[in-house]
Amino acid sequence: MDPTIAAGALIGGGLIMAGGAIGAGIGDGIAGNALISGIARQPEAQGRLFTPFFITVGLVEAAYFINLAFMALFVFATPVG
């Protein structure tokens, strides 16, 4: 097997993980910003704002783990040798 294919798989896996990490960081930041803004506007609604925040953060992180699964598929399913 050509080493270029293995190198391409590793580079592609790294790009997948980098994109997922950047996306998760941006998504968590936007959700956190919305939470802080909502609590600053209405402090009494703090309890009602935490549930959608944690659901949103969980979905954003789930998307990151889906990226992790695709990275593992691309890197480890590449035939070597």
Curated annotation (Swiss-Prot):
GO terms for molecular function: lipid binding; proton-transporting ATP synthase activity, rotational mechanism. F(1)F(0) ATP synthase produces ATP from ADP in the presence of a proton or sodium gradient. F-type ATPases consist of two structural domains, F(1) containing the extramembraneous catalytic core and F(0) containing the membrane proton channel, linked together by a central stalk and a peripheral stalk. During catalysis, ATP synthesis in the catalytic domain of F(1) is coupled via a rotary mechanism of the central stalk subunits to proton translocation. F-type ATPases have 2 components, F(1) - the catalytic core - and F(0) - the membrane proton channel. F(1) has five subunits: alpha(3), beta(3), gamma(1), delta(1), epsilon(1). F(0) has three main subunits: a(1), b(2) and c(10-14). The alpha and beta chains form an alternating ring which encloses part of the gamma chain. F(1) is attached to F(0) by a central stalk formed by the gamma and epsilon chains, while a peripheral stalk is formed by the delta and b chains. The gene is atpE. It is found in: Cell membrane. One of its GO terms (cellular component) is proton-transporting ATP synthase complex. Keywords: ATP synthesis, Cell membrane, CF(0), Hydrogen ion transport, Ion transport, Lipid-binding, Membrane, Transmembrane, Transmembrane helix, Transport. This is ATP synthase subunit c. The record marks E61 as: Reversibly protonated during proton transport. Gene3D superfamilies: F1F0 ATP synthase subunit C (1.20.20.10). Belongs to the ATPase C chain family. Its main location: membrane. InterPro entries: ATP_synth_csu_bac/chlpt (IPR005953), ATP_synth_F0_csu (IPR000454), ATP_synth_F0_csu_DDCD_BS (IPR020537), ATP_synth_F0_csu_sf (IPR038662), ATPase_proteolipid_c-like_dom (IPR002379), F/V-ATP_Csub_sf (IPR035921). It comes from the Bacteria. It is a multi-pass membrane protein. The keyword Transmembrane helix applies. The chain crosses the membrane at residues 5-25, 57-77. Signal peptide: none annotated.
